[in-house]
From Swiss-Prot:
The lineage of its organism: Eukaryota, Metazoa, Chordata, Craniata, Vertebrata. It comes from Xenopus laevis. Keywords: Membrane, Transmembrane, Transmembrane helix. The gene is cnih2. GO terms for molecular function: signaling receptor binding. Belongs to the cornichon family. One of its GO terms (biological process) is synaptic transmission, glutamatergic. It is a multi-pass membrane protein. Residues 32-72, 162 are lumenal. This is Protein cornichon homolog 2. InterPro entries: Cornichon. SMART domains: Cornichon (SM01398). Regulates the trafficking and gating properties of AMPA-selective glutamate receptors (AMPARs).
């Protein structure tokens, strides 16, 4: 059994894709937590709980921001590895999400070093819905990619007969 550089790339990508799936699942859980915190009518009228809700939103947004750049870098590494391994079909499948990540990164708010997920704007229902839909779409993409990479690991490993 001989491993090629492409097989190594697929194996590494398989492991990193699993970590991206966990990142995105955490995003979905965090957005759902923000949504339920936003919709709870009993807690909306409680002023003593308001400060705690604001701190919770700030904490969640801070944690979300810490996962954005690693996600973008890992996906950029995928594209770089597939380009070096001359896996053009796989690179072509990953390029649209890479361009979206670049667009999203370069169109972040200009008022600071924060990439996105501002505590004030995230509580806007439209922005929260957009972020949640984006997370579900990314989860679908990463899950499909995971199984594609799993298939390609087996397809790129060549068995050498004796």
């Amino acid at each position: 059994m001989a491993f090629t550089f492409a097989a190594f790339c697929y194996m590494l990508t398989l492991v990193l894709c699993a970590s991206l799936i966990f990142f995105i699942i955490w995003h979905i859980i965090a957005f759902d937590d923000l949504r339920t915190d936003f919709k709870d009518p009993i807690e909306q009228g409680n002023p003593s709980r308001a400060r705690e809700r604001i701190k919770n939103v700030e904490r969640v947004c801070c944690l979300l921001r810490k996962l954005v750049v690693p996600e973008y870098c890992i996906h950029g590494l995928f594209c770089l590895m597939f380009m070096c391994a001359a896996e053009w079909v796989t690179l072509g499948l990953n390029i649209p999400l890479l361009f979206y990540h670049l667009w999203r990164y370069f169109h972040r708010p200009a008022d600071g070093s924060e990439v996105m997920f501002d505590p004030v704007s995230i509580m806007n229902v439209d922005i929260l819905n957009y972020c949640q839909k984006e997370a579900w779409c990314k989860l679908a993409f990463y899950l499909l990619s995971f199984f594609y990479y799993l298939y390609r690991v087996g397809a790129t490993v060549r068995y050498v007969s004796a």
